[in-house]
Regions:
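Short, amphipathic C-terminal "tail helix"
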Residues: 147-149, 153-177
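Glycine-rich ThDP/TPP pyrophosphate-binding loop and its adjacent helix/strand module
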Residues: 1-34
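Short beta-strand segments
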Residues: 10-13, 39-41, 157-161
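Active-site/ligand-binding loops adjacent to catalytic centers
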Residues: 1-2, 27-34, 38-128, 173-200
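Short glycine/serine/threonine-rich phosphate/pyrophosphate-binding segments
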Residues: 11-22, 47-48, 132-140, 166-168
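Conserved acidic residues
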Residues: 6, 104, 154
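Glycine- and other small-residue-rich loops at beta-strand/loop junctions that grip anionic moieties
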Residues: 6-11, 107, 129-132
Length: 200
């Protein structure tokens, strides 16, 4: 379409999907273009918005080499949420470095608001979204409403991934009033991050 995005928005767990989404636009951003990259986290696993930048193992058992990342610590036990891919304790090194250098911003949304946004999108577009995509759509709607209020004509780029099965659990849980937001497990968070005292 020969048009550069003003916003690139995507959900983030470990960072592979989000990193791939923003990668083509990173050089221009580093060279001065004001493209805003927004990573959307699950509120119960806020690796960027509440984590620390340190070296940590990529796996929970600590068998893999330690790499620099934003992390909640491999010992952090996140609550069970339907978007399982967003429960990882850390963020990929390259994405973490870009966040550290303030090329990326991050927000955290809960299940109910994200799934409600996803349901709205599904009803409007006819696409049954994956749980991860619902978080993206939630933030996209927030930014679109901001544009409407300010009269901005910002171009927003985002990706949505369709549900890979006929599992209707997210929608059933939302419509039946059974879905609830999970918060970060404070005790587990404090214990896990406590391992890094003196290292950050």
């Amino acid at each position: 379409v020969n048009e550069a995005p003003d916003y690139v928005i995507g959900s983030i767990g470990a960072g592979s999907h989000f990193g791939g989404l923003i990668a083509p636009f990173v050089p221009a951003r580093i060279q001065g273009r004001d493209t805003r990259f927004v990573a959307v986290e699950e509120a119960s696993t806020p690796s960027l918005t509440r984590g620390v930048y340190t070296e940590e193992s990529a796996d929970a058992a600590g068998l893999m080499p330690q790499v620099p990342m934003y992390t909640l610590g491999r010992e952090y036990a996140p609550p069970g949420v339907l978007a399982g891919a967003m429960r990882y304790h850390g963020v990929a090194p390259i994405v973490s470095a870009l966040y550290r250098e303030k090329h990326i911003s991050a927000v955290a949304h809960g299940q109910i608001e994200s799934y409600s946004a996803g349901l709205m999108f599904t009803r409007a577009e006819g696409i049954v979204l994956s749980p991860l995509a619902m978080y993206t759509v939630k933030e996209v709607i927030e930014q679109a409403l901001r544009c409407k209020e300010t009269g901005s004509d910002d171009t927003i780029l985002f990706t949505v991934t369709p549900a890979v099965s006929t599992d209707s659990t997210p929608y059933d849980s939302l419509l039946d009033g059974l879905l609830h937001d999970e918060k970060a497990e404070e005790a587990s968070l404090k214990k896990s991050l406590g391992r890094f005292i003196g290292r950050i």
